[in-house]
Amino acid sequence: MNNKKTATNRKGMIPNRLNKFSIRKYSVGTASILVGTTLIFGLSGHEAKAAEHTNGELNQSKNETTAPSENKTTKKVDSRQLKDNTQTATADQPKVTMSDSATVKETSSNMQSPQNATANQSTTKTSNVTTNDKSSTTYSNETDKSNLTQAKDVSTTPKTTTIKPRTLNRMAVNTVAAPQQGTNVNDKVHFSNIDIAIDKGHVNQTTGKTEFWATSSDVLKLKANYTIDDSVKEGDIFTFKYGQYFRPGSVRLPSQTQNLYNAQGNIIAKGIYDSTTNTTTYTFTNYVDQYTNVRGSFEQVAFAKRKNATTDKTAYKMEVTLGNDTYSEEIIVDYGNKKAQPLISSTNYINNEDLSRNMTAYVNQPKNTYTKQTFVTNLTGYKFNPNAKNFKIYEVTDQNQFVDSFTPDTSKLKDVTDQFDVIYSNDNKTATVDLMKGQTSSNKQYIIQQVAYPDNSSTDNGKIDYTLDTDKTKYSWSNSYSNVNGSSTANGDQKKYNLGDYVWEDTNKDGKQDANEKGIKGVYVILKDSNGKELDRTTTDENGKYQFTGLSNGTYSVEFSTPAGYTPTTANVGTDDAVDSDGLTTTGVIKDADNMTLDSGFYKTPKYSLGDYVWYDSNKDGKQDSTEKGIKGVKVTLQNEKGEVIGTTETDENGKYRFDNLDSGKYKVIFEKPAGLTQTGTNTTEDDKDADGGEVDVTITDHDDFTLDNGYYEEETSDSDSDSDSDSDSDSDSDSDSDSDSDSDSDSDSDSDSDSDSDSDSDSDSDSDSDSDSDSDSDSDSDSDSDSDSDSDSDSDSDSDSDSDSDSDSDSDSDSDSDSDSDSDSDSDSDSDSDSDSDSDSDSDSDSDSDSDSDSDSDSDSDSDSDSDSDSDSDNDSDSDSDSDSDAGKHTPAKPMSTVKDQHKTAKALPETGSENNNSNNGTLFGGLFAALGSLLLFGRRKKQNK
C-alpha cells in the first residue's frame, strides 16, 4: 500500500549499532479547574413577580394598631460555607442581572359623595394602592471550563445502549417516552448562607421593627449559595419545600414551571411547583453531565402565603428546606386592611398563566345601615367572562370573616350570588349589582370576588374601578396596573404547539430514514428562540425520539449534539423533509401547527487499524525475505498528532503488531530497538517489504495501513582471530663411508667380494590440524596454509678397484645395494566453523620441511699379488631412517635419526691350505685385509671431506 507515508512525513533511521531509540512519554493532565456556575430560579415564559403597594392617608382604627409579637429568627441551616465567594483577580467574572419583571401599579381611590349636592361636601382621601410586579434576579458566575464539551465519564469506550426498533408512524408524537423519575439527590446538593430578607421593608415607628408590608411594594427574597456533587446525573431530582406561611412568587402566583439557569441562560434543572404541597421538584438536565464542580448562588422572590398568614401586625415563621438544609425566620406581616372603610378592595392574586386579576372587595365592613347600595365595577383593559360564573357575592355572618389578607375562607361564607342579578354591559367591561334587592334598608355586609381577564385589544395596561353608591355617600375605589420591564403578556387562550421528532442511525449513509434503521438513544437536543436564547433541552429516548412542548408560533433553532462514536450524515438529501437529516443545527417554524420534521441522522464513525511486522534481517539487505523470521517482544508505541501516547503494544511470536479502533488522522509509530540489535537499512524496496525506521509518521484516510515494518540485525560485537602456525623442519644426514684397501701380493687366488648395502629411509609426516570454532553472529575468514617440504637425498657411491697381479685367480665381487626410501606425509586439517555477524580471521600456516641426506660411499681397492687365493668380502649396509612428524595445533619438531649399520666388518677367513706356514699365511692374509680395510676407510674419509 502506498497510502502510508511520503518522503516528507516519514522519519527514517540511519543504521548504526549505537543507535538509541526513545519513547516519548506524554501525560494528559486534565485540569480540574473550578466550575462555579451561578444558577438562578428562572421565571419561565418571562414570569413576572408582583408586589402590591398600598399608599394611603386613611386613619387606622384602634384594633389595627395592636403591637406585634417579637420578631424572632430561627436558623437550622448547615453551617457549611462556600470556600470562595469572591471574584478572582485573574478573570473577569460577569455579574449578570436578568429581569423578567413587570411592575404592576394598583392605584386605589376612595371618594365619598353626599346624596344632596347642595349639602356640605365631606371628602375623604383614600389610599393609593400600587402593586409592583417585579422580579429581580442577580447572577454571579465562577466557571471552570475543564471538560466543557466532554461528559464527566471520559471513557473512550462508548456506553452500550439497547435501541428498540422505531415505530413506522413518525408523526405519532405521543410515542416519546415520558421522563422517568430520577434519583433523589437532596444529599448531593449542598446549600449554605441561606437567608430570607425583606426587600425594602417598612419600619414600625412604634416598635422600631422592620415589617413586611405586603401591599406596599414589599417582597421577600430567599437567598442561598450551593454546590452540586459531580456524581449527580441527568434525571436526578432535588426539592425546595416551603413552610406553612411562605411560598415562591409574589402577588402573582408562582408558575408551575420553575427552571434553574446559569449566568449564560443555560437550563441546569427543570422545576415543577406543586401548590398543593408547596414544593418545587427540580430535575437536572444533561448540563450536569457536561460540567464538573458546579457551584453558585441564587436569589428568589417569595411572598407570604395569604391563606395561612392572615392577620396584620403578626410575626409568622417563614421556613424553607432546600435539599436537606432547613432555614426559618420570623417576619411581621401587614396587608393594610382598613376596617373602617365601607368599600376597600385588593388584588388577591394574579394568575400566572392567563394574567387574570382575582379581586376581593369588602363592602360595609363598618356595618352601616343603608337604604340604597349599588355596587358597580368598571374595567379598562379587562373584561368579564359571564360564562365563567366567577362573579361571587358572599354575605358575611361573622365580622372575623373580613380577614386582613383579603383571602377569606369562602367555605364559611354564605353564597348569595343567586339572590342578585349581575348586569353586564359595555361589552362585558361593566358589571352592576343592586345589593338592596327590594329591601328598604339593610346593614348587611358582603364580600365580593371577581375575575378580570386582560383584553388583548387594549393598548393600555388597564385599571379596575369600584363604586358603592349609597343613600349617604358614593364611595369609589380604583385599582390601576402598569407593566414595567417587559413582563410577559401572553394569556392562557393562546394555543401551544409541539416541535421535535427523531435522531436515527443512518447505517447506509444515504441521508434518508429507512424502515430498518433504528433511533439513537441519549442524544442531547437544545431548543433556542430566534435570538439564540436557550429555552429548553432534552435527551432522545430509547427510540431516538425527542419533543419540545408548549411552544407558541414562531421561529426556533434546534441543536443536536454528535453522539460519541458517530459522524453526522449528509443533510437535506432529497425533497421530503420528513425523512431527511437536517444536520447538527436546524431551524424550525411553528405556524398554527406542530412541527415534527426536525430530524438528524448519524452513522457510526469507521474505525481503522495500522501495524504489521518487525523482523530479523539476517542478511542486512533491508528487505523482508521469506526465510527471515519475526522478532518477538519489540515494544511499539502509537502517538496521535499532538504527540500524546494513545497505545502501546509488543510484537507477538511472529513479529506481528497491530493498533485498532483508530479514526482517520495523523499518527506516529515508534519502535523501541531491541537490546543487542542494530537498525537495518530503511526504504530499500516496496513499502510492504521494506523497513521504515525507528519512528514513522503515517496518515490514515479512510483505510487500514499494514505496511509499517521495521527490521534489525545482530550487532558486530564479536571478533575472533585464530592464527595457527606450524613449522616442521626435519633434516636427516646419513653419511656412510667405507674405504677398503686390500693389497695382496701372492700367488694365491684372491676372491674379493664387496657388498655395499645402503638403505636410507626418510619418513616425513607433517600433520597440521587447525580447529577454529567461533560461534557468534560474525563473519569468519579462515585461511589454512600447510606447506610440507620433504627432501630426501640419498647418494650411494661405490667404487671398487681390484687390481690383481698374480698368477692366482682373483674373484672380486662388488655388490652395492642402495635403497633410499622417502616417505613424506603432510596432512593439514583445517576446520573453521563460524556463525557470526562480525569478522573473524583465522590463519593457519603449517610449514613442514623434511630434508634427508643419505650418503653412502664405498671404495674398495683390492690389489692382490699373490699366488694364494684371497677372498675379500666387504658388506656395507647403510640404513638411514628419518621420521619427521609435524602437527599444527601441537607443535612437535621431529628429530631425525640416522643409523648406519656395518654388519660385516670382519673378513671371512680363507680355507686352510694345509701349508705349514699356515699361521704365517694367516697373518699375512689378515694384514692384507686390514690394510685394505684401512685404505678403504681412509679413502672414504677423504672423499667425504672433499664432498
From Swiss-Prot:
Disruption phenotype: Bacteria no longer enhance SARS-CoV-2 replication in host (green monkey kidney Vero E6 cells) cells. Note the phenotype is not restored by wild-type protein.
Residue ranges, compositional bias (Acidic residues): 685-695, 712-886
Leader sequence residues: 1-50
Pfam families from the UniProt entry: Big_8 (PF17961), Gram_pos_anchor (PF00746), SdrD_B (PF17210), SdrG_C_C (PF10425), YSIRK_signal (PF04650)
Family: Belongs to the serine-aspartate repeat-containing protein (SDr) family.
KW Secreted (keyword) present: yes
Extent of Basic and acidic residues compositional bias: 72-83
GO cellular component: extracellular region
Assembly description: Homodimerizes; via N2-Domain. Interacts with host NRXN1; this interaction mediates bacterial attachment to host cells.
Source organism per UniProt: Staphylococcus aureus (strain USA300)
Lipid bilayer topology: Peptidoglycan-anchor
Low complexity composition-biased segments: 912-927
Superkingdom of the source species: Bacteria
Top-level taxonomy: Bacteria, Bacillati, Bacillota, Bacilli, Bacillales
Subcellular location as annotated: Secreted, Cell wall
Subcellular location, principal: secreted
The name this protein goes by in its record: Serine-aspartate repeat-containing protein C
